[in-house]
């Protein structure tokens, strides 16, 4: 039986709408983790498809400066993986949450304990950007009987056979990395990006979402045309931190019709 995240996103896709997933850094709020529910409900009220929630880490190899700085602010507020898990247990939302974490915090917490502790929360997906596909067995057995999907990341340099290997049996969605490098580097796209995404979309039987560097209205239109939706991180994180208006951008993304 498909997991909740898969069913939710497939329903949006079937309705002919673009999927929109914003990224936020847990604890990057003037109230620290006490402000997490407020941010989640703000995004939920705007109609987002799911919400990616980052766990701060001191060595975030895939993060650009905006998200790296957000992680440092979160750590300065005292955010820990344990405290985040306890906070997530108290948050009620109909929107699926997807945890984005490097493997080290997960390893320190204990993968089995982490999954068990999140069993009754809104967390329905897990992204581990520094976990190679060959080491997915460190995590997958603990997710097998849960409603949490392990999300595969597929980079631009991935050939068709490798793509098939990475996404075989995957749940939730495929995270298509739009740029070579860290998050937030908008516009630095390869010439064959659209071809790559169309190819990936053809071999995947779950939604394909494009992320890394997506930040403009033009990006929304481009990537919704060749994939099932977008993930936006740095633009959202920066706006929330600086108190900049972001509602119109989110509403445009949520309302995108195929």
Swiss-Prot record:
It is an enzyme of class 4 (lyase). InterPro entries: Aldolase_TIM (IPR013785), RibuloseP-bd_barrel (IPR011060), Trp_synthase_alpha_AS (IPR018204), Trp_synthase_suA (IPR002028). One of its GO terms (molecular function) is tryptophan synthase activity. The keyword Amino-acid biosynthesis applies. GO terms for cellular component: cytosol. It catalyses: (1S,2R)-1-C-(indol-3-yl)glycerol 3-phosphate + L-serine = D-glyceraldehyde 3-phosphate + L-tryptophan + H2O. Its EC number is 4.2.1.20. Keywords: Amino-acid biosynthesis, Aromatic amino acid biosynthesis, Lyase, Tryptophan biosynthesis. The active site is at residues 52, 63. Pathway: Amino-acid biosynthesis; L-tryptophan biosynthesis; L-tryptophan from chorismate: step 5/5. The keyword Lyase applies. Belongs to the TrpA family. Tetramer of two alpha and two beta chains. The alpha subunit is responsible for the aldol cleavage of indoleglycerol phosphate to indole and glyceraldehyde 3-phosphate. This is Tryptophan synthase alpha chain. It comes from Streptococcus pneumoniae (strain Taiwan19F-14). The lineage of its organism: Bacteria, Bacillati, Bacillota, Bacilli, Lactobacillales. The gene is trpA.
């Amino acid at each position: 039986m498909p997991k909740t995240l898969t069913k939710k996103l497939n329903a949006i896709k079937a309705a002919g709408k673009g999927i929109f997933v914003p990224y936020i850094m847990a604890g990057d709020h003037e109230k620290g983790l006490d402000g997490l529910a407020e941010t989640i409900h703000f995004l939920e009220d705007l109609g987002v498809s799911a919400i990616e929630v980052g766990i701060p880490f001191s060595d975030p190899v895939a993060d650009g400066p905006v998200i790296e700085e957000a992680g440092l602010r979160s750590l300065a507020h005292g955010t820990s993986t344990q405290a985040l898990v306890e906070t997530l247990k108290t948050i009620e939302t109909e929107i699926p949450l997807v945890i984005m974490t490097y493997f080290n915090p997960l390893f320190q917490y204990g993968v089995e304990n982490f999954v068990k502790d999140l069993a009754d929360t809104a967390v329905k997906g897990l992204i581990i950007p520094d976990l190679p596909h060959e080491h997915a067995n460190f995590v997958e057995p603990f997710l097998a009987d849960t409603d949490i999907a392990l999300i595969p990341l597929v980079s631009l340099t991935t050939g068709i056979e490798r793509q098939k290997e990475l996404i075989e049996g995957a749940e939730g969605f495929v995270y298509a990395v739009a740029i070579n490098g860290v998050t937030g580097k908008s516009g630095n796209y390869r010439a064959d990006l659209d071809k790559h995404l169309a190819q990936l979309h053809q071999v995947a039987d779950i939604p394909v979402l494009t992320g890394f560097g997506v930040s403009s209205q033009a990006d929304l239109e481009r990537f919704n045309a060749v994939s099932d939706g977008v993930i936006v991180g740095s633009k959202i994180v920066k706006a929330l931190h600086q108190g900049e208006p972001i509602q119109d951008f989110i509403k445009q993304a949520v309302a995108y019709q195929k």
